Amino acid sequence: MPIATTNPATGETVKTFTAASNDEVDAAIARAYARFQDYRRNTTFAQRAEWAHATADLIEAEADQTAALMTLEMGKTIASAKAEVLKSAKGFRYYADNAAALLADEPADAGKVGASQAYTRYQPLGVVLAVMPWNFPLWQAGRFAAPALMAGNVGLLKHASNVPQSALYLADVIARAGFPDGCFQTLLVSASAVEGILRDPRVAAATLTGSEPAGQSVGAIAGDEIKPTVLELGGSDPFIVMPSADLDKAVSTAVTGRVQNNGQSCIAAKRFIAHADIYDAFVDKFVEQMSALTVGDPTDPQTQVGPLATEQSRDEIAQQVDDAAAAGAVIRCGGKPLAGPGWYYPPTVITDITKDMNLYTEEVFGPVASVYRAADIDEAIEIANATTFGLGSNAWTQDEAEQRRFINDIEAGQVFINGMTVSYPELPFGGIKRSGYGRELAGHGIREFCNIKTVWVG
């Protein structure tokens, strides 16, 4: 994929960039490594917090321009782009306010270990490579940058090739906020350059959010080099609705959960599992609301669903839906790419999917919802867990016993009861199974790239 800004609403390439040379990449790594030696020793949490708050101030002040840039590069609606920008600022503020406490020394009972002092200390690892996706250009990269910088690490960002201007903006705003030169750099490079960067002995660790194949590649390289990694990969999140649920609220949340970010979110609800007693009512209401969504120009504030980010994404989704229909699945609404310029695919609802169909196990990264009927809670959980992924999940029920079953038995990194899966700075984010390992956000996220050092003083 070329490093370029291409407008998904028109297919027009707006701006292209030249990839960094090997020498330029080496210089960036050297700059980061040299900066780390000083940054970790000679900056305090208070100083870093001042710069992080200044970063948030700038992001908020420039929200309209940055939102427009993200919409231009990857097609998210202008309303969701603006919300993402403000959320990114919130992430910087959260770590500015909480990093010192999250990474404070943890005392142990010194007497029990025969010491005068005994405690755990969290120390930064060094240069961390972040390989980030296009679907949340600022929030995803920012939620790496904020905890990494506050912990005393320095960052190298290899962003997706279709959001280069968003990537450059983040490095620029961090520098303008006062973080020292070399603390956070964007590398405009292709995916093929990642291996060389990660194998460089000056790079201590890596984090990747992206596809399963990309995660396998980075995980294998990091494993070979014995370097810690965090992988946040795909998801095929279940959304279960039981008879006691507030059906209208569940349906409206299901619609939002499926088409958020034009359906291109790892934690978007993708597989909808309705109890047999309310299945027909759920499907009718769901199809009605999905069909009524406004699809169009993402810069129009009235648009609810914009284009997919790439032509390849649109074509892959169309093929997945066509294959399911050919195998006997029923298309309740949508189901065909929209005519005209841009990479649009309409909100689509599919039922009558059987276990032998590819759609039963595949992740669909767009506004396509699969709906399943469950005879009881046991079957609902069985369907929910019938995936190689385990990122997020939703369950709707007022029955407390059912809530406990879902919390305990759904195989996922996150379970949201009577609500939509959302990432919050205050809560750890990540998955199990083939959705990856490690955690972002909250205290767990900032500690991922710290040396957990045991200190014993006799």
UniProtKB/Swiss-Prot annotation:
InterPro entries according to UniProt: Ald_DH/histidinol_DH (IPR016161), Ald_DH_C (IPR016163), Ald_DH_CS_CYS (IPR016160), Ald_DH_N (IPR016162), Aldehyde_DH_dom (IPR015590), ALDH_GabD1-like (IPR044148), GABD/Sad-like (IPR047110)
Coiled coil: none
Enzyme class: oxidoreductase
Keyword NADP carried by entry: yes
EC number(s) stated in the UniProt entry for this protein: 1.2.1.79
SUPFAM superfamilies linked: ALDH-like (SSF53720)
Keyword Oxidoreductase: yes
Keywords: NADP, Oxidoreductase, Tricarboxylic acid cycle
Residues binding NADP(+), per UniProt: W134, N135, K158, H159, A160, S161, G210, S211, L233, E363
Stored Pfam families: Aldedh
The reaction(s) this protein catalyses: succinate semialdehyde + NADP(+) + H2O = succinate + NADPH + 2 H(+)
Active site (catalytic residues): E232 (proton acceptor), C266 (nucleophile)
PROSITE patterns for the chain: ALDEHYDE_DEHYDR_CYS
Gene Ontology molecular function terms on file: aldehyde dehydrogenase [NAD(P)+] activity; succinate-semialdehyde dehydrogenase (NAD+) activity; succinate-semialdehyde dehydrogenase (NADP+) activity
Gene Ontology biological-process entries: tricarboxylic acid cycle
Function: Catalyzes the NADP(+)-dependent oxidation of succinate semialdehyde to succinate. It is believed to be the main source of succinate semialdehyde dehydrogenase activity in Mycobacterium.
Assigned protein family: Belongs to the aldehyde dehydrogenase family.
Name the record gives this protein: Succinate-semialdehyde dehydrogenase [NADP(+)] 1
Origin species: Mycobacterium ulcerans (strain Agy99)
Organism taxonomic ancestry: Bacteria, Bacillati, Actinomycetota, Actinomycetes, Mycobacteriales
